[in-house]
Amino acid sequence: MASSVLSSAAVATRSNVAQANMVAPFTGLKSAASFPVSRKQNLDITSIASNGGRVQCMQVWPPINKKKYETLSYLPDLSQEQLLSEIEYLLKSGWVPCLEFETERGFVYREHHHSPGYYDGRYWTMWKLPMFGCTDATQVLAEVEEAKKAYPQAWVRIIGFDNVRQVQCISFIAYKPEGY
C-alpha cells in the first residue's frame, strides 16, 4: 500500500513538470507565437497620431486682472435664456435649487492657508432656504432678481443640491456686480 502511494506521487510530479512545459493551443484567438517576443520601443511621439500638420494652439486664460469664479467662469455672462436653460437642467436632474451670495469676494481666494484647496474662498451666505419642491425655473430667476435688489454689489450663484446623495452637483454664477 505504501509503495503505491509513493509511486503515484512520483508520477504526479513528473506529469506536472511535463504540463508546465506544454503550451495549449488557443481556440478562437491568435496564438502568441505569431507576435514578436521583444519589440523595439518607439519613443518618438510624432509616430503616435497625426492631424496632418494642422496644429492650432488655444490661448490660455490670462491670469492678470481676471478672476476665477466657478467652473467655466471664463465664458461670457449667461443671458436670461441661458440661465433658464441651466435652471431647467438642474430641475430635470432632480436637484434642489439654492441661491447663495457673497458681498466681499465672489472669487476663489486663500484666506487661512497658502496651499491650494477646493474650498478656499467658497463659503457663501445662503439666500433664504433651499427651494425644496420647486418645479418652475422662473421662480428661481425671481429669487435671483430679489437677491440682486437686496445686494446690488454682491455675487449671486445658483447651486443644485442632490438631497439623496447629500452633495452639491452644479454651481454657476447668476449675477456679478458691475465691473467684474
UniProtKB/Swiss-Prot annotation:
Q: Which InterPro entries match?
A: RuBisCO_ssu, RuBisCO_ssu_dom, RuBisCO_ssu_N, RuBisCO_ssu_sf
| A Gene Ontology cellular-component term | chloroplast
Alphabetical keyword list: Calvin cycle, Carbon dioxide fixation, Chloroplast, Photorespiration, Photosynthesis, Plastid, Transit peptide
Q: Name one GO molecular function term.
A: ribulose-bisphosphate carboxylase activity
Transit peptide, from-to = 1-56
Enumerate the subcellular locations listed in this protein's record, separating them with semicolons.
Plastid, Chloroplast
**Keyword Plastid carried by entry:** yes
| SUPFAM superfamilies, per the entry | RuBisCO, small subunit
Q: Which GO terms describe its biological process?
A: photorespiration; reductive pentose-phosphate cycle
Question: Which PANTHER family does the entry link to?
Answer: RIBULOSE BISPHOSPHATE CARBOXYLASE SMALL CHAIN 1, CHLOROPLASTIC (PTHR31262), RIBULOSE BISPHOSPHATE CARBOXYLASE SMALL SUBUNIT 1A, CHLOROPLASTIC-RELATED (PTHR31262:SF10)
Q: What does this protein do?
A: RuBisCO catalyzes two reactions: the carboxylation of D-ribulose 1,5-bisphosphate, the primary event in carbon dioxide fixation, as well as the oxidative fragmentation of the pentose substrate. Both reactions occur simultaneously and in competition at the same active site. Although the small subunit is not catalytic it is essential for maximal activity.
The record makes one more remark, namely:
The basic functional RuBisCO is composed of a large chain homodimer in a 'head-to-tail' conformation. In form I RuBisCO this homodimer is arranged in a barrel-like tetramer with the small subunits forming a tetrameric 'cap' on each end of the 'barrel'.
Q: Subunit structure of this entry?
A: Heterohexadecamer of 8 large and 8 small subunits.
UniProt record similarity statement: Belongs to the RuBisCO small chain family.
What is this protein's record name? Answer: Ribulose bisphosphate carboxylase small subunit, chloroplastic
Gene transcribed to yield this protein? RBCS
